[in-house]
Amino acid sequence: MKTKKTLAILLAALLLLSFGCSKKTETPVAQTATEAPAPAAQTATEAPSATAVAPAPTEEPADVSFTVTDMTGREITFDKPVERAVALSAADCEIIFALGAEETLVGRGEYCKYPLEATEIPSVQSGYETNIEQIIALQPDVLFMATMAQTKEQVEQLEKAGIRVVVSDAQNIEGIYTSITLIGDVMGKQAEAKAIIAKMQAVFDEIKAHPIQGEKTVYFEISPLQWGLWTAGAGTFMNEVAEMMGLKNCFADVQGWAEISEEQVIERNPDFIVTTTMYFGEGPTPEAEIMSRAGWENVTAVKEKNILNLTNDELTRPGPSLAEGVQMLYDFVVESLAAMELAPAA
């Protein structure tokens, strides 16, 4: 009987133990039912991840700056191509037109009248009384001016206003080539500059190949008698013109542009006279005025009427049209000499 009681107690204990274990195993099942979906379920509902794309490389802006050295030896740097320019000298203005860069001109010196289209551009006071305020008001990127027309103070004032100043100073034919090259570099017209120079050189080379014979002399009259006689001496492009033609400049012994006297001209007795005096339609022409001067009647050029008036500054403006002036003078001398040979003896 005692044995049966013991078995009953053991059986009850096993049942309690079994019930307790089953309660413990149900709890995790209930918990997993309320948990968030498994990672696999999450990836099924997420948006697909985008593939990372490297940003496109950014190009550095092209460097368009450039530096030139003007005819005074100054280095001038431009940070961009020239869009607005002012030219004070007639030669520089002519060069800009010849280069095909006239659309950049927003101002010119009052004596810049060639080509005729230049007169349509607003003018500013230039020379010894250059009007800096007028120039600044035009807001140019660059100002071209001659050595004789600028001072250190003017340059400083212009550069302070953000205007680059480029100085040209052609005193001979090589200097003209340098001016054309310089302005071509500034305006981005290098090829055009080379073409202009080549064309001029072709004219000069042809004349040099057929020099005038007989050691004839020429007198260049830059300023007429009423204003005081001036001529072109050694170191000027007009003296070079005489030499390339085979002529002798009567005043090759003076330096540069020089004031002379009537007596000196009469004494040197030139075979040819070239005057650059402008004729305004009133009074005697420059040729007639020279022919009528008292005491000049025995000068060979006057007796033979070998006087040429070049009215468009072809020989005084150091630009591309100098070649035209040289050709005109050469043709005049050749034709005059031919006429003299054909003329009957007196």
Where do the model's predicted regions map?
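Hydrophobic core
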Residues: 11, 15-19
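Alpha-helical, coiled-coil/dimerization segments enriched in small aliphatic residues
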Residues: 111-114, 230-257
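Structured C-terminal subdomain patch of bacterial secreted/periplasmic proteins
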Residues: 177-178, 185, 194, 205, ...
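A short, structured surface patch at a secondary-structure boundary
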Residues: 84-138, 142-148
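Positively charged n-region of N-terminal signal peptides that target proteins for export
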Residues: 1-11
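Bacterial Sec-exported substrate-binding components of ABC uptake systems
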Residues: 5-7, 19-91, 190-219, 272, ...
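Extracytoplasmic ligand-binding site segments that recognize negatively charged/polar headgroups
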Residues: 151-154, 166-182, 215-237, 281-284
